[in-house]
UniProtKB/Swiss-Prot annotation:
CC annotations in GO: distal axon; myelin sheath
Protein name per Swiss-Prot or TrEMBL: Calmodulin-like protein 3
Organism: Mus musculus
Domain of life: Eukaryota
Purpose: May function as a specific light chain of unconventional myosin-10 (MYO10), also enhances MYO10 translation, possibly by acting as a chaperone for the emerging MYO10 heavy chain protein. May compete with calmodulin by binding, with different affinities, to cellular substrates.
UniProt keyword annotations, A-Z: Calcium, Metal-binding, Repeat
Gene3D superfamilies in the cross-refs: EF-hand
Length: 149
């Protein structure tokens, strides 16, 4: 399954994995998963977190390692994101609910995830997705960015 991913995708997933793996020990615990989800405005219960980890945790050790994470991500990519999941992700970034993701909103979410980006890096990310050149990312541009990855 994971062998159908490009090197670039694997590198991106490794970076995402390291955002979750707060202590850098190579595995994601329910606590680490909860921290990231709460930083994104979600409020999962301990039981929900345990359920998510159990779903991915193939070897049954109670944590998610990188190969397990890769398998889950490649599956998720196969079941291309449902419209509702994409809308939900957009809402996480669109803090003020105006239908656009600004550089400030993108920086805010990335900082909460532990990614310290320079203004230039944030601007580059916005420019890469901003096809109509208005300086912010609307829903259609957001979808296009996700689908073209």
């Amino acid at each position: 399954m994971a062998d159908q991913l490009t090197e670039e995708q694997i590198a991106e997933f490794k970076e995402a994995f390291s955002l979750f793996d707060k202590d850098g020990d190579g595995s994601i615990t329910t606590q680490e998963l909860g921290t990231v989800m709460r930083s994104l405005g979600q409020n999962p219960t301990e039981a929900e977190l345990q359920g998510m980890v159990n779903e991915i945790d193939k070897d049954g050790n109670g944590t998610v390692d990188f190969p397990e994470f890769l398998t889950m991500m490649s599956r998720k990519m196969k079941d291309t994101d449902s419209e509702e999941e994409i809308r939900e992700a957009f809402r996480v970034f669109d803090k003020d609910g105006n239908g656009f993701v600004s550089a400030a909103e993108l920086r805010h979410v990335m900082t909460k995830l532990g990614e310290k980006l320079s203004d230039e890096e944030v601007d580059e990310m916005i420019q890469a997705a901003d096809t109509d050149g208005d300086g912010q990312v609307n829903y259609e541009e957001f979808v296009h960015m996700l689908v073209s990855k």
